[in-house]
A protein has these predicted regions:
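Assembly/oligomerization interface modules of large self-assembling protein complexes
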Residues: 22-83
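Cationic, low-complexity basic patches in intrinsically disordered or flexible, solvent-exposed regions
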Residues: 266
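N-terminal alpha-helical "arm" segments
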Residues: 1-25
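Long, contiguous amphipathic alpha-helices that act as assembly "spine/axial" helices in icosahedral shell
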Residues: 74-134, 195
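Gly/Ser/Thr-rich active-site loops/lids in small-molecule metabolic enzymes
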Residues: 216-221
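Conserved small/polar residues in nucleotide/adenosyl-binding loops
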Residues: 257-263
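Extended, solvent-exposed, turn-rich assembly/linker loops in the middle of proteins
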Residues: 131-215, 228-246, 250-256
């Protein structure tokens, strides 16, 4: 349905001091702190998880060498989505408006809507990361869980007990990340690179990441997280995260990828 003079009645009358409600600042490109962007020219993209080899065993003199098998374990498919929204104006609404050019005004509003949709959908990958169904990865498990199946057994990428952001929980996360293993149970030299938090956690994160001494204690201990450079890229706030208690650590082991298609020539 087109926007008509009925929806813009006040703008047909002289004497308005201002029109407001559309000129707000935006949170720009916060998805880039979570995802690395790659281009795509296909309807979907697939990524295959590979398994290498187990640790080698001792071979007795003259005995045959033991052989091991490498294999594919699972495939993740990423299906592109088309995000669309439009508006239309009646000729009379355009001609009889006494103020700014309304087509330009609402084109800017539409761009803001599209941009915020992009940020919301990107953050929803983390917002839904703990859900047991409907948002599973290629291994059939939620993005963050304690039962990711591998050839060597189940692996976890979450705390044994979920906890709010604190010195204790952040240090335990560093310990857990250092113990990550691959499909065959070989240790991965993974390191936390960036802390991703909702805005409600920014003050806690600032104290934890930048205080020279430990936070909330009278002990004259150094802040080990800071002095050891455990999170070299610091913390970033994502204003589209919906759980005020959640925090996420991006490691250097595997990156999240945001796949983009060329903009349609018809848009």
């Amino acid at each position: 349905m087109a926007i008509s003079r009925q929806q813009l009645a006040k703008e047909l009358e002289p004497g308005l001091n201002a029109l407001f409600g559309l000129e707000y600042k935006n949170y720009e490109n916060q998805h880039a702190e979570i995802f690395d962007t790659e281009n795509s020219d296909r309807a979907f993209e697939e990524e295959v998880m590979l398994s290498g080899f187990d640790k080698a065993g001792v071979k007795s003199e003259g005995a045959a060498v033991a052989y091991d098998n490498a294999q594919e374990t699972f495939t993740a498919r990423y299906q592109h989505e088309t995000i669309a929204l439009a508006f239309s104006l009646t000729e009379e609404a355009i001609e009889d408006n006494l103020y700014d050019k309304i087509s330009t005004r609402y084109t800017k509003a539409l761009a803001r809507s599209m941009a915020q949709t992009k940020q919301t959908k990107a953050a929803n990958v983390l917002n839904n990361a703990f859900k047991a169904s409907g948002y599973n990865g290629g291994d059939g498990e939620s993005l963050i869980g304690n039962a990711h199946p591998t050839i060597a057994g189940n692996l976890s990428n979450r705390p044994a007990t979920l906890a709010d952001l604190s010195e204790t929980s952040l240090e335990q996360a560093m310990i857990d990340i250092a113990s990550f293993k691959d499909e065959r149970g070989l240790k991965i030299a993974a390191k936390a690179m960036k802390l991703i938090i909702p805005s409600a956690n920014q003050f806690v994160a600032e104290r934890l990441m930048k205080s020279a001494n430990r936070v909330g204690t009278a002990d004259n201990d150094i802040n080990a997280l800071r002095s050891m450079g455990m999170v070299p890229q610091g913390y970033v706030v994502n204003n589209f995260l919906t759980d005020d208690d959640a925090f996420f650590l991006k490691t250097d082991a595997v990156s999240y990828t945001h796949l983009t298609l060329p903009t349609s020539q018809y848009v």
